[in-house]
Amino acid sequence: MEDLLRQNIQRTIGQQITDAQFEQFSSFLFLKSFDKKTILCEEGEHCKYVYFLLKGSAFSYLVNEYGDKHALQFALEGYWITDHYSFFSGKPGIYTIETLEAGQMLVLNRENFERICDSNHLFERFFRILIQNAFIGLQYRLAKTNSEDAEHRYAEFSNLYPAFIQRIPQYLIASYLGIKPQSLSRIRKEQAGKK
């Protein structure tokens, strides 16, 4: 736990933190275990926590009028996940977050989020950078979804996130990329044939 979280903080802020700073940061989080298919936040309900994955995987999604899940974000070990809209506004969530595998997470509530940011400027900087990176990633994904074909989107996704390809169900990856599962299957076969 300690190494994964500490590495995440240091990589994000681009500098080392002291043991005292790490202990201070860690004191605001609590450890929780989750089963597979646990709903962490549900659309329409207030999302009260930010989650840091130590073990396992999770994803966020919207459900359309036909009951189809549209994946928005994936998280494996070393990733943070939340419904930013609900967590920061206090309003009902706009999507659902569910575990894909059983695992453990460090959990941070809104009150402790404010305390952690107020306690040290490095921690406020850390979360600012995380939120900026989430926003940048979302803008980039929207631009690519609207300007590139499915083959390019999958190739880039598989190059950037090879661990996701191994652990996330293909139908969810297809949903994330905005394509049908059958199309993803065809693309994967074509790309495998080129290797």
Language-model regions, residue ranges each:
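Cyclic nucleotide-binding regulatory module and flanking cytosolic helices
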Residues: 1-30, 86
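Localized chelating/binding microdomains
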Residues: 14-17, 104, 144-147
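Residues that recognize and position ribonucleotide moieties
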Residues: 32, 51, 73, 98, ...
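Cyclic nucleotide-binding regulatory domains
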Residues: 39-99
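Residues that scaffold the ATP/ADP-binding catalytic core of kinase and kinase-like folds
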Residues: 61, 83-84, 115-116, 157, ...
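A small-molecule sensor/coupling module
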Residues: 93, 112-149, 153
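Phosphate-/nucleic-acid-contacting segments
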Residues: 148-195
